[in-house]
């Protein structure tokens, strides 16, 4: 199969299925304190995971589009992860593989694109700005680069507000699987302008 380097690519037909620096800034929060031992202990346990995978449902909603897909996310921190999107029939629509030496994306036609920046590639291929680097943390229920967030009564992440360039991302957590150790999200939503991305995690496997 031909391999192409991402430069300036047209919007893929299946693309819609995808999913001020200051060193003294401190996390802004309401509710339970992020300095509480409970939150610090939970965050430490999540960060100690050496591998995780989850599968579930993905939805993208905007003023002009409303689409859905099944997703599979496999992550081996700090630099390896795989995102697979499939249609209701189980066929692959898009696959992203990120490794220390680069990123490869394969579309539903089997065409491959390689590059260094997963977020940039997704934006070029789909026209959508998806905060993949932080989403790897958000999907686990930790704030990533965000310094503004709130905790619920169980000392679990409830909301995040994150500014990336000229975009503001608002993340909200609807539910967690508290039978897992550590507890992990089962439903979350990202909102940026007219974009709304919903993720529902049906199951988790962690190490």
From Swiss-Prot:
Q: Where is the lipid attached (N-palmitoyl cysteine)?
A: 22
Quick one: where is this thing mainly located? membrane
Tell where it localizes. Answer: Cell outer membrane
Q: Which GO terms describe its cellular component?
A: cell outer membrane
Q: Name one GO biological process term.
A: protein transport
Q: How far does the signal peptide extend, from start to end residue?
A: 1-21
Q: Which InterPro entries match?
A: LolA/LolB/LppX (IPR029046), OM_lipoprot_LolB (IPR004565)
Q: How does it sit in the membrane?
A: Lipid-anchor
Task: For this UniProt record, give its keywords in alphabetical order, as a comma-separated list.
Answer: Cell outer membrane, Chaperone, Lipoprotein, Membrane, Palmitate, Protein transport, Signal, Transport
Q: Which domain of life is it from?
A: Bacteria
Spell out where lipidation (S-diacylglycerol cysteine) occurs.
22
Q: Which Gene3D superfamilies match?
A: Lipoprotein localisation LolA/LolB/LppX (2.50.20.10)
Q: Could you say which protein family the record assigns here?
A: Belongs to the LolB family.
Record's function text: Plays a critical role in the incorporation of lipoproteins in the outer membrane after they are released by the LolA protein.
Known partners and oligomeric status? Monomer.
**Name of this protein:** Outer-membrane lipoprotein LolB
Q: Which organism is it from?
A: Pectobacterium atrosepticum (strain SCRI 1043 / ATCC BAA-672) (Erwinia carotovora subsp. atroseptica)
